């Protein structure tokens, strides 16, 4: 069976379903690497992507974001000039009640009898204004970090915004963006 549209799973409307010891057949996470780039260096700026509203991000989208951002930064900045971290983990188990369709489907389908559903994937639950991912870079590579965040926003189910922080953790988004436009 194919992958369902993401709009089915993006809302946080059901209770959390995370206790894997009670779930038979729960799939494992597709995303395994959460830190990329130069993990030991100190960088001047932190660019973080925040969620504008509560949402669920499927593990397929997280893996696509990881591949896209990492590849873009490696190509434009170089492996030793950034640190990229995904800050959310897909704990939420997604379920689907497969419905039988077609001719004589009523003979072998259950319909809504026992409709709890089978596990089909995982998702990360994100609260409003929570950091989804972060890139640490120096000032000369800041525009590439912002480009990477723009590419990551396209793969999210709902809108997001980015913030730029200095080493002390102060929000310097407006100051940095005003100097970059000149």
UniProtKB/Swiss-Prot annotation:
GO terms classed as biological process: translation
Alphabetical list of PROSITE patterns matching this protein: RIBOSOMAL_L10E
Annotated keywords: Ribonucleoprotein, Ribosomal protein
GO MF annotations, alphabetized: structural constituent of ribosome
Gene Ontology CC, one term: ribonucleoprotein complex
Top-level taxon: Archaea
Family according to the record: Belongs to the universal ribosomal protein uL16 family.
Annotated protein name in UniProt: Large ribosomal subunit protein uL16
Classification of source organism: Archaea, Methanobacteriati, Methanobacteriota, Thermococci, Thermococcales
């Amino acid at each position: 069976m194919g992958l369902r549209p993401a709009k089915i799973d993006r809302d946080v409307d059901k209770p959390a379903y995370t206790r894997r010891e009670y779930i038979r057949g729960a799939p494992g996470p597709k995303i395994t690497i959460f830190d990329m780039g130069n993990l030991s260096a100190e960088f001047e700026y932190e660019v973080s992507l925040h969620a504008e509203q509560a949402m669920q991000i499927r593990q397929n989208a997280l893996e696509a974001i990881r591949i896209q951002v990492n590849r873009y930064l490696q190509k434009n900045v170089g492996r030793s000039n950034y640190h990229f971290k995904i800050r959310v983990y897909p704990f939420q188990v997604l379920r689907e009640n497969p419905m039988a369709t077609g001719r004589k489907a009523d003979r072998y389908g259950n319909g809504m009898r026992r409709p709890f559903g089978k596990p089909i994937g995982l998702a990360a639950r994100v609260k409003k204004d929570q950091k989804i991912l972060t890139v640490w870079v120096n000032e000369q590579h800041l525009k590439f970090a912002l480009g990477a965040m723009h590419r990551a926003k396209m793969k999210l189910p709902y809108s997001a915004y980015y913030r730029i922080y200095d080493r002390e953790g102060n929000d310097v988004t407006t100051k940095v963006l005003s100097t970059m436009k000149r």
